[in-house]
Amino acid sequence: MPTNIYVTEEELKKQEKIMKEIAEENKGKNLYYHIETYGCQMNVHDSEKLAGMLEKMGYKYTENLEQADVLLFNTCAVREHAEIRVLGRVSQMKELKARNPNLIIGVSGCMMQEKNVVEAIKEKYSYIDIVFGTHNIYKFPQLLWEALNSQDIVIDIIEDTKNVIEELPVKRDSNLKAWVNIIYGCNNFCTYCIVPYTRGREKSRKPEDIIAEVKELAQKGYKEITLLGQNVNSYGKDLDEDITFAKLLYKLNDIEGIERIRFMTSHPKDISDELIYAIRDLDKVCEHLHLPVQAGSNKILKKMNRKYTKEHYLEIIDKVRSNIPDIAITTDIIVGFPGETEEDFLETLDLVERVRFDAAYTFIYSKRAGTVAANMPDQVDDAVKHERLERLIELQNKISLEKSAELRGKIVEVLIEGISKRDSNKLTSRTRTNKVVHFVGDESLIGKLANVKITETKAWTMQGELVEVIR
């Protein structure tokens, strides 16, 4: 596996040329593609880039797998369950390939950065045409061209790139909201996490490239951007210029046309006063902070290599809420980490009760080969993990319900995102604190900011009445 390569301008021009050649060859043909995406928002945005390249090469999107000429699976390696699900799904494609031998099937993403997975694909899934990872998406046109012109499986995995690849075509899922990468990779090496091995070391995009992308989005009518990174708080540390994540937020806040700025994910050890003040003071930065705590026991946090304590985390929460009283705080929590006792788990429940998160994404610890935690003694019994997860979910659901109920009768600002999937007479909107509100309204309001009065609340969604359109 080649390590840490530098991608030259010549290489990118070569890929551009191949895209044009494939597009020319596809002229007049009705060719279709389908992409299935697993995992985080980074993967979702990677799939948007793959879709952008496919559209530039003359393919159109289809929901119908039977109609597809190119079928891609963009995979996630964070939890074992996700890997099993992906491989199960890929195995179902054998019959589809038998019915349509010209179908190109590709598997990409974080799972492909694991050597054992690539070997398994070669041995058990001979009908797969293309295998590539997270670092060479830019090379997809060439890989597709090779697959179209060969009977052999095309495998291209690199360990990392020294530079950030800019200006890949993007076919965005929304005309209103956009994902914007600001930093790739992770340097934290939490003992349970495979991400540093699949996504590489931290690489920040240059601020001028981010600003140019956001300005272009504003010109196209996008209202909301979400800044993406495994740890956005590390942004700029690897750059030669004087730029931090908070300073980047100030620059983006000045861009005309953008109404809302969100970001994810933040590591608690890197939360700065500067960032807290930026969220407080910048009118476009939404009052929502996703701050994964993972556990409430100092013993477990140390074993996880999280580099903060329960007390430090609670201090951060106090500082955030004293500066931004109405902020919504969400988190990630893992139960059943190796060595977690009942006392350790009770520390987690105590933290949840004290912080009162608006929502928590809760997971059972999943052993990942190649991580430090996979070889730790005292692995927790599965039945115990599931029992603890149920108790945690029960507590958090109660808190989420109570937090939502606090908004009943209040008027909140929402961005109207589209027609409700469950009731075509209603619109779906989102508050600045990232809560979903449904209300009766005309579809001409989509893309507008409005004030809505909350009439009913559940743990995750709310019902409201339109008060006024802001703009």
UniProtKB/Swiss-Prot annotation:
It is found in: Cytoplasm. InterPro entries: Elp3/MiaA/NifB-like_rSAM (IPR006638), Methylthiotransferase (IPR005839), Methylthiotransferase_CS (IPR020612), Methylthiotransferase_N (IPR013848), Methylthiotransferase_N_sf (IPR038135), MiaB_methiolase (IPR006463), rSAM (IPR007197), rSAM_horseshoe (IPR023404). SUPFAM superfamilies: Radical SAM enzymes. [4Fe-4S] cluster 1 binds at C40, C76, C110. Residues 31-149 form the MTTase N-terminal domain. It catalyses: N(6)-dimethylallyladenosine(37) in tRNA + (sulfur carrier)-SH + AH2 + 2 S-adenosyl-L-methionine = 2-methylsulfanyl-N(6)-dimethylallyladenosine(37) in tRNA + (sulfur carrier)-H + 5'-deoxyadenosine + L-methionine + A + S-adenosyl-L-homocysteine + 2 H(+). Its cofactor is [4Fe-4S] cluster. Catalyzes the methylthiolation of N6-(dimethylallyl)adenosine (i(6)A), leading to the formation of 2-methylthio-N6-(dimethylallyl)adenosine (ms(2)i(6)A) at position 37 in tRNAs that read codons beginning with uridine. This is tRNA-2-methylthio-N(6)-dimethylallyladenosine synthase. The gene is miaB.
